[in-house]
Amino acid sequence: MLPLRAVSQVAGMNNLSVLDMTASARAAGLGMDYLPIADGDLSIAVDNPSMFMPSMHNAITFSYVGMFSHVGMGQVSYARDFGRPGVFAATMKYHNYGLFDGYDEYDNSTGRFYACDVTAILSWGFKIDSSFSFGVSAKPTFSQYASYTALAIAFDMSASYVHPNRRFVATVIGRNVGAQFFFGQAKTDWTPFEISAALSYKLSKAPFRFFLAITELQQWNLMYEDMYNPSQTTDPFTGEVTKRSGVAKFFDNAGRHVLAGVELNIGKVVFLRFGYNFRQMREMQASSGFNTSGFSYGLGLRIKGFEFSYARNNYHLLQAPNYFTLSTNLERFMKKR
């Protein structure tokens, strides 16, 4: 149901991938889910709660992701600063997987059914001092696939350091601490827990900000093991038998932990973004040859208090999700009254 995600846990070996999927076009353009950047972007703070700041008071953001075929995701977020207690935010995220034709084990039609996930995110961010901040998000998620329903409750926690000049930002984040409960079944699954770290650095005399993330610190081996080809020495498309050295496997595995991106700021109005995810490329490639899976790019425009972002993240050779985000601050409208 969810083959789109290739970042949390070993591919094909976890449930609730929906908890990891960002709706932020800015984050998607840079190839990351949690950006370490302190510039008041609410869409970023939803995924990295330690990035909430007082300047987000009355900020609101809308996002839509057009995925494959009829699959889509929408998100709306609102934040409010309460002074010393910190910044609180509420987010609603909806994943629609479309309408399906149902059949039983005898190939008899059982009618049509919908599949969807709905997540309500409640977030809190607090500045410890001028440089350090902390945040936490609660993410209850209701899932319904035909007659199957489940409820997951997961938490994200992050801590960030922001240099006084704001050119250097670092974040450590723990995501998806929780469990999923299935209605009508005596079954409980753990949500896909992840510990990651990320940093960004803006050059002092050039309009570039670089991003780097080290993901899945709780698990070294991120290579997918095919039960029908456990040694992974046979290409499933060409049938070619290959053998890799231990050194090659080490660097392959190490590369799967690394995400990289760069943002170009043109006159504080236009933003160009590029990202690369080696693991996504390795898991989604159709053959041993080069392909664009794992590459992402995006565009941002900031005009008269509104910020629009678009991104495209290449998960597959033929299709890729398109991300759209519109952000503003309601304060600018209130002041005009």
Please provide the spans of the model-predicted regions.
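Subset of outer-membrane beta-barrel
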Residues: V7-R337
